Amino acid sequence: MNVADEIKLALADLAIPEKAAFFPRFFKSGKGEYAEGDQFIGVTVPDQRKIVKEYWKKIPLEELSELLRSEIHEHRHSALLILVTKFEKASESKDEIIKFYLAHKAYINNWDLVDNSCYKILGRHCFEANDNSVLETLSNEENLWSKRMAIVSTMYHVKRGEFEVMKKLVLKNLNHPHDLMHKANGWLLREMGNISEEELQQFLKAHYRDMPRTTLRYAIEKLDEDTRQDFLKGKI
């Protein structure tokens, strides 16, 4: 039995049947939904983190690949949490982890898988290398998850007061048809506003009339009520 198999068994021991029944509805894995066919065993994220703490040092990347290619959602999510930990703890070159992450992006195919890994790995790498070309490449792909990966990765930049790449990518996919992009764009704009309300309002004044309503609502959530209403009613 390899380490990946040990992790699968450990996760199975933590499975909660009620969660296994609920997660497919929550993560939209039904027929015709964005995560159609995804399978769940019902392991919560806090329980997955217990597994990560125990196994992140033990499992090599080649076995992590097996876990990340699994049809079971919690296997993939745990694999990504392990990869984040490996990246954060790495004392030498992290290029191998970046290559691994991008080589497996086809399996990073739901919003939680994207959001809980991309900015901590890809975003940090791009910020520290001062090279955002991979984010621009991802934002140009047709795949929904690649586009979301690109914009959410800029969270690392935004939290450090660097807004330009985020604004550029938001505008590139401002009117994407899927609400998961509308929400992601609004979320990142709101994060910018948490650091600089002036930057947020300046951006919104230039573009709010062109953005989806969901994006606007997410972006203005933390503004005072009068300002929110002015944006919603088109008075600015």
Predicted regions and their residues:
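Alpha-helical scaffold domains
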Residues: M1-I236
